[in-house]
Regions:
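Short hydrophobic/Thr-rich beta-strand motif most characteristic of the beta2 strand and flanking loop
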Residues: 25-39, 46
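Alpha-helix N-cap recognition
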Residues: 39-42, 164
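Conserved acidic segment of CheY-like receiver
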Residues: 2-22, 56
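Conserved binding/recognition cores within well-folded domains
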Residues: 115-160
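CheY-like receiver
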Residues: 45-127
């Protein structure tokens, strides 16, 4: 389960990001929870109640609590959450470095760029959480490393009518 927050005062952008996330989740058979916020104070309140996010999409200029103040608050509690800024304002780039964003995306959102950044974020989240993914037959299996006692590789090949047998 990957917990994602989207925080933007533009409802159309929030809906658009949510739609892209749902499409990505369905296409890749992943499990997301997505919380939507229209300002930084709502996101801050959710975090104060104990919600932990892996990835946050954040606008810079919002009414009650802007994206930079929100990110500073988030970083004071969680240094590992990935922040992707989605904004029309690139004149804040120097200030953004203080909160160590993962990526910056300009509006309007480019789907290809969005998915590229999301791929990178998912890879980073998986490696940080100790998740190991591997292909078995035609399926992609996922294992949480902290749940693994040990790995053992045993491969049997039986030639019976030109069939190969694999035991996992």
């Amino acid at each position: 389960m990957i917990n994602i927050a989207v925080c933007d005062d533009d409802l159309e952008i929030t809906k658009s990001i949510n739609k892209l996330l749902m499409k990505y989740q369905d296409e890749r058979d992943l499990d997301f929870t997505v919380d939507l916020f229209n300002d930084g104070s709502g996101l801050k309140s959710s975090i104060l109640k104990g919600k932990k996010y892996d990835l946050i999409y954040l606008d810079i200029e919002m009414r009650q609590m802007n994206g930079i103040a929100t990110a500073k608050y988030i970083r004071s509690i969680d240094t590992t959450v990935l922040l992707i800024y989605v904004s029309n304002y690139d004149n804040y780039l120097k200030e953004l470095f203080e909160v160590e964003p993962f990526r910056f995306m300009s509006k309007p959102i480019n789907d290809k760029r969005f998915y590229m950044f999301l791929d990178l974020a998912i890879d980073r989240i998986r490696s940080a959480n100790g998740i190991y993914c591997f292909r078995f037959n035609k399926d992609i299996l996922t294992v949480i490393l902290r749940d693994v006692i040990y790995f053992e590789t045993v491969s049997y090949t039986h030639l019976r009518a030109h069939e190969t047998e694999l035991h996992l």
